[in-house]
A protein has these predicted regions:
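Intrinsically disordered, low-complexity, charged terminal extensions of DNA damage-control enzymes
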Residues: 1-28, 33, 194-369
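Catalytic cores of DNA base-excision repair glycosylases
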Residues: 3, 8-12, 16-219
Length: 369
C-alpha cells in the first residue's frame, strides 16, 4: 500500500515513528484517561475552535455536573449554557443537549458506535463523528481537522496549501491510518499539528516524521492575523433587594441577548448602552477590558448606572431581569459578563484582585473565549 508519494514501507515506518513519539510526548489531558464515548464526545465538541487551555478550565466542572448522557439530556438548556459559559460558540452546547435527548429517545440511551451513524446526530459532522468513532469505539476511520489537514498537506507536498488540498486529504489520511490503534493514531496526528507542525514557524528539526516530509524546512512565517476592533459599553446597575434574614441583598440588572443574535444568542449579560463619547458625562468606567472573539477585539467599558438612566426596556423584545449575586453562577452568562463581574468583585465569594479605574484604551486586560 502506498500513500501518495510514500511507499508501503515508508508508510509503515512513519506510523511507527509517529506512535513512538506520541506515546512518549502526548499531553496528559483528562479526556485521554477515559474510554467513555460520551466523555470523548463532550471533549471533542468543546475543542471545536477552542484552545485546549480554555477547554481544560471547563471540562472537569461540566463532566462533574453532567457525568452521563442521561443527565445532560434531562437538564434545562439554561443550566447547560450556564456550565458552558466562557467557552463561546454556545450553539455547540445547545446542539450537544439536543443530540443527547435524541440518543435517549431514539437510541436507547446508547451513543451510536460508527461514524456514519454518529453523523446523523445534531451538531456532529465528519470530523467529530470520526473522532468519537475512532477514539471511543476503535473504528478505523481517519480524523481530518485543521491540524491534520496542515500536516498531511506538508507531508505529501500537496500544491496550493491546505485549502486547495482539502479534497485530497481525507483519502490520504485514511490510507495512512494505523488500523490497530486508530484512535491513538488520530490523536497523534492532531498532537503533531498542535505541538510541532505549527501554522507558522513549524519545528521541523523536532518532528518525528521529518524524514518522510516532502516540504520540511520550506515553510515561511505566516503574516499576523489582522484583527478588527469594536467598542462596546455596558451598564452596571445595582439595587438593594427584598429584606431577608435582616439583610437586604444586592441585586444586579441583566439583559438577555436576542435569540437570533449571531453571537451568544440567548445568553445573559449586563445591559448594553450607547457609547459615552465623553466618558459618561465625566464619569470614568469602573472597568475596561479587551475581549477577543475570533477576528474582532471588543473594547468594553463598564459604567455604574442607575436603572432610571436606561432608556425604555432595552428596545423591542429585550428581556431584562434583576438577579441576586448568589444566582449568578447558575445563569447562562456570556464569558465577558462572567469575567467582568468577577473583576468588579460582584461574583459571590470572589474577592479577585484590586481593579484600577482605567481610562479608555489604557491598561486593558485581554479576555479570550
Amino acid at each position: 500500500m502506498s500513500t501518495g508519494k510514500l511507499s508501503a514501507q515508508q508508510v509503515r515506518d512513519l506510523r511507527e515513528a509517529l506512535m513512538v513519539w506520541y506515546d512518549r510526548n502526548r499531553r496528559d489531558l483528562p479526556w485521554r484517561r477515559t474510554g467513555d464515548p460520551y466523555a470523548i464526545w463532550v471533549s471533542e465538541i468543546m475543542l471545536q475552535q477552542t484552545r485546549v487551555a480554555a477547554v481544560l478550565e471547563h471540562y472537569r466542572s461540566f463532566m462533574a455536573r453532567f457525568p452521563t448522557l442521561d443527565t445532560l439530556a434531562a437538564t434545562s438548556e439554561d443550566e447547560v449554557l450556564a456550565h458552558w459559559s466562557g467557552l463561546g460558540y454556545y450553539r455547540r452546547a445547545r446542539l450537544l443537549r439536543k443530540a443527547a435527548q435524541f440518543v435517549v429517545a431514539e437510541c436507547g440511551g446508547k451513543l451510536p458506535g460508527t461514524a456514519e451513524k454518529l453523523r446523523s446526530l445534531p451538531g456532529i459532522g465528519d470530523y467529530t463523528a470520526a473522532a468519537i468513532a475512532s477514539i471511543g469505539f476503535g473504528e478505523p476511520v481517519a480524523v481530518v481537522d485543521g491540524n491534520v489537514l496542515r500536516v498531511m498537506t506538508r507531508l505529501q507536498g500537496l500544491e496550493g496549501g491546505p485549502k486547495a488540498a482539502a479534497s485530497q486529504v481525507p483519502a490520504l489520511a485514511q490510507r495512512l491510518l494505523d488500523r490497530k490503534r486508530p484512535g491513538d493514531f488520530n490523536q497523534a496526528m492532531m498532537e503533531l499539528g498542535a505541538l510541532i507542525c505549527l501554522p507558522s514557524q513549524p519545528q521541523c528539526t523536532h518532528c518525528p516524521v521529518h524524514e518522510f516530509c516532502h516540504t520540511r524546512g520550506e515553510h515561511e512565517v505566516a503574516p499576523a492575523k489582522q484583527m478588527l476592533s469594536r467598542r462596546i459599553t455596558y451598564a452596571v446597575v445595582k439595587r438593594k433587594g427584598r429584606l431577608r434574614h435582616g439583610l437586604r441583598r444586592t441585586e444586579l440588572l441583566l439583559e438577555r441577548r436576542p435569540e437570533d443574535a449571531s453571537l451568544m444568542a440567548g445568553m445573559w449579560e449586563l445591559p448594553q448602552i450607547p457609547e459615552h463619547p465623553e466618558g459618561a458625562g465625566g464619569k470614568l468606567p469602573l472597568l475596561s477590558l479587551r475581549h477577543a472573539i475570533t477576528n474582532t477585539n471588543y473594547y468594553a467599558n463598564f459604567f455604574e448606572t442607575q436603572a432610571t438612566e436606561l432608556t425604555g426596556e432595552g428596545g423591542s423584545g429585550t428581556e431584562r431581569r434583576w438577579v441576586t449575586q448568589n444566582e449568578l453562577p447558575d445563569m447562562p452568562l456570556t464569558g465577558l459578563a462572567r469575567k467582568a463581574l468577577k473583576r468588579l468583585k460582584l461574583w459571590p465569594g470572589y474577592s479577585g484582585r484590586s481593579v484600577p479605574v482605567l481610562l479608555p484604551g489604557e491598561g486593558l486586560d485581554q479576555i479570550v473565549i
